[in-house]
Amino acid sequence: YDKRRHPKKLTPLAYKQFIPNVAEKTLGASGRYEGKITRNSERFKELTPNYNPDIIFKDEENTVMNQWPGVKLRVTEGWDEDGHHFEESLHYEGRAVDITTSDRDKSKYGTLSRLAVEAGF
């Protein structure tokens, strides 16, 4: 009797596929918009910085490295205050992140999306 957990087969997400299958701004995906966080707001203190020098952005489980040795997770946008997103963007609250891989290989994006879903994003 084998009690070991077998790794789940990761199916890449399709282009423009969402998990859950609803748009980013809907209640089912991200909850209510709570308002933009600025550097001077109290909520700014709740954001968690990441200073790990070995990765472009934190990947504690090394899922990207395990999937593609030598490749790092690359965050292109996280919390933001520049005003370049739509008015109620979750980037302004620190609840949205745009990711890619360090080698910028677009063929990896479907699997990268699935890894993000499996990690709870």
Swiss-Prot record:
GO molecular function: calcium ion binding; patched binding; peptidase activity
UniProt keyword Lipoprotein present: yes
Subcellular location as annotated: Secreted; Cell membrane
Post-translational modification: The C-terminal domain displays an autoproteolysis activity and a cholesterol transferase activity. Both activities result in the cleavage of the full-length protein and covalent attachment of a cholesterol moiety to the C-terminal of the newly generated N-terminal fragment (N-product). The N-product is the active species in both local and long-range signaling, whereas the C-product has no signaling activity. Cholesterylation is required for N-product targeting to lipid rafts and multimerization.
Chain positions recorded as Ca(2+) 1 binding sites: 60-61, 76-77
PANTHER family: HEDGEHOG, SONIC HEDGEHOG PROTEIN
Quaternary structure and partners: N-product is active as a multimer.
Source species, domain of life: Eukaryota
InterPro entries: Hedgehog (IPR001657), Hedgehog_sig/DD-Pept_Zn-bd_sf (IPR009045), Hedgehog_Signaling (IPR050387), Hedgehog_signalling_dom (IPR000320)
Binding-site positions, Zn(2+): 91, 98
Positions bound to Ca(2+) 2: 61, 77, 80, 82
Family according to the record: Belongs to the hedgehog family.
Record's comment describing the protein's domains: The sonic hedgehog protein N-product binds calcium and zinc ions; this stabilizes the protein fold and is essential for protein-protein interactions mediated by this domain.
GO cellular component, one term: extracellular space
Record's keyword terms, sorted: Autocatalytic cleavage, Calcium, Cell membrane, Developmental protein, Hydrolase, Lipoprotein, Membrane, Metal-binding, Palmitate, Protease, Secreted, Zinc
Function summary: Intercellular signal essential for a variety of patterning events during development. Signal produced by the notochord that induces somite patterning, dorso-ventral patterning of the brain and early patterning of the developing eyes. Displays floor plate-inducing activity. Binds to the patched (PTC) receptor, which functions in association with smoothened (SMO), to activate the transcription of target genes. In the absence of SHH, PTC represses the constitutive signaling activity of SMO.
Listed name of the protein: Sonic hedgehog protein
Any single Pfam family the record assigns to this protein: HH_signal
Gene Ontology biological-process entries: animal organ development; cell development; cell fate specification; cell-cell signaling; central nervous system development; neuron differentiation; proteolysis; regulation of gene expression
